[in-house]
Amino acid sequence: MSLILVATESTVLAIDPRDGTVAGHDLPDRPTCLAADPFVDGRAWCGTRRGGVFRSDDAGASWQAVGLAGRDITSITASPAQRDLIWVGTEPSEVWMSENAGDDWRQTARLETLPSSPEWSFPPKPDTHHVRWIACHPSDAQQLWIAIEAGALVSTRDGGRIWRDRVDGGPWDTHELAIHTNAPASLRVAAGDGYFESDDSGATWRSPEDGLDVGYLRSVAIDPGRPDVVIVSASTGPRSAYVAGVSDGRVYRREGTGRWERARDGWPDPPRTIAPLLSAGRVAGELWAADERGLHRSDDGGRSWREIARYTKTPNHLRGLSVLR
């Protein structure tokens, strides 16, 4: 079974789900984001506050700097459609790419040329904004979606040469965007302004929220075996979504066009936990959740959960969750 990596504000934890073993591995700078490599066993990518991008080839045990030092890295992903293609987002909002596993980097077309850019602003730091999330098309390496926090979800069909601005009715404050391999035109979004979904690659959007009793969504994942099963984490607002001790996070599950149902089997009622980070696993029904208590697993598409590992100390903030190949 694959190792699971959890990035906190100070370290990257490597968790063995077979026995719950947790090993912490420090980087030269504070982690900000995390991604597993879909092609190379044991390879992971981590962005940091000012130290740039780091790569691990031994399941998080050691990390090597691979570029973009001095930039504030806020998001990172490895393309599932092209080996060694890595996408990175920064604050202020820029997108960088490497086609050789971090040996060389180049910036895509500048995002601030988009008409909506004067309206972009991150509320805690209103004079700036950043790339919160990068989502790649499962089979088209040139197509991806970029979440600007806050103000826009933009896209490209040509690898960032031309960016397409946000569309009416779409999410404003996207935190995460999930795509299933078998439904590449279906986008599922967890946003600060609610839940959004599109079945035409983001041209049009809808917001089915029947059953959601809170409106601030942090994370989203799709059952690997069923593209119609979506889970999200949510809370009443940003502080209670992220900060242990004042948290009221919860997890919801939805099948097809049905209503949202809150996960209760193995998941505590609020106010017991932050809104967890979520990730799809490697087999049908397998989903993962990380909160301030530890790592949790579902084998039935999010209906029930069980704790796999508990951290040795409570982290203040979680920065990333990745299931290694």
Locate the predicted segments by residue.
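Extracellular glycan-interacting surfaces
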Residues: 1-325
